[in-house]
Amino acid sequence: MSDSPERVYPMLLDFVRKETISKNLLRVTLTGEDLIGFPEDQNGSHIKVFFPNQASGILQLPVREGDNVIWPEHKPVPRAYSVRQYRAAVNELDIDFVTHGEETPGGGWALKADIGSQIGLIGPAGPDPLIEPADWHIIAGDLSAVPAISAILEKLPSDAKGYVFIEVDEIEDIHDLVHPEEMAINWLMRNPHDAEPALAKAIKQLPSPEKATSLSAFIAGENQSVINCRKILRNDYQIARDKLYAIPYWKRGKTEEAYHDERHDVMDAVY
């Protein structure tokens, strides 16, 4: 995997419109002069979004001075998201937000966003491609991973084979995805009483791929679920480390700020 080209300065972007994808998934379209030149081939890549300061409601973006980042008086709230799609012809960027409620920095901003609303953005970054070429693929994640999963499926060759597992809390979040015919899409309902996350359980029960000489996988979502899935894929499926990209987006019971350092420890772990 190579790294995506990174635009390191904060861009200021303007709200254009929004679209409901499912009950708890909301697409926001953005534009702005700073967005011109954004790479077209980075759908699914990581971006960092800056939301208005929660106390003042004011959006002020950090600036770089040499190797230093200078934060403003009204420090914005940073959150990690994925590029859903960029359309250079109209200079529009789509970001899909999981809407947990109006009190959250990201989902709350998306729910209330209207003409005049703005955010800051840095990116794209991360591995390219998000899933390595192989005879057979395993893709798994929760609702927070759907934007990246959707982008991956749209980029895969038409003859790609494998399984996709997506865990949701509510049946109303199940929706159609564009995908290669032989990538089997499986929606799973989360059971909070299960000791083992649904994604890990589903991957354990997969039949062995026939005539597959290479495997690759993409796993994203809640911390413990990602860890469990990664262990199974490394230990049971013997997927090579360079063919497996596993990224925890969040951890149940922890804020983004409290989880930040732990996330990087999980990503750096070797299995």
Curated annotation (Swiss-Prot):
Q: What Gene Ontology terms describe where this protein resides (cellular component)? A: cytoplasm
Query: Where does it live in the cell?
Result: Cytoplasm
Q: Decide whether keyword Cytoplasm is in the record.
A: yes
Concerning InterPro entries, the annotation shows:
FAD-bd_9_SIP, FAD-bd_FR_type, FNR_nucleotide-bd, Riboflavin_synthase-like_b-brl, SIP_C, SIP_fam
**Class of this enzyme:** oxidoreductase
Principal location: cytoplasm
Q: Name one GO molecular function term.
A: ferric-chelate reductase (NADH) activity
* Keywords recorded for this protein, A-Z: Cytoplasm, FAD, Flavoprotein, NAD, Oxidoreductase
Known EC number: 1.16.1.7
One BP annotation, GO: vibriobactin metabolic process
Known catalysed reaction(s)?
Answer: 2 a Fe(II)-siderophore + NAD(+) + H(+) = 2 a Fe(III)-siderophore + NADH
By its UniProt entry, which Pfam families does this protein fall under? Answer: FAD_binding_9, SIP
Q: Using the record's annotation, list all stretches that form the FAD-binding FR-type domain.
A: 8-131
| Obligatory cofactor(s) | FAD
- Per the record's keyword annotation, is Translocase included, yes or no? no
Q: Which PROSITE patterns match?
A: FAD_FR
Under PANTHER family, the record lists:
FERRIC REDUCTASE, NADPH-DEPENDENT, NADPH-DEPENDENT FERRIC-CHELATE REDUCTASE
UniProt lists the family membership as follows:
Belongs to the SIP oxidoreductase family.
Give a short account of what the protein does: Ferric-siderophore reductase involved in iron removal from the siderophores after their transport into the cell. Acts as a major ferric-vulnibactin reductase catalyzing the reduction of Fe(3+)-vulnibactin, a catecholate siderophore synthesized by V.vulnificus.
How is the subunit organization of this protein annotated in UniProt? Answer: Monomer.
Name assigned to this protein: Ferric vulnibactin reductase VuuB
The organism is Vibrio vulnificus (strain CMCP6)
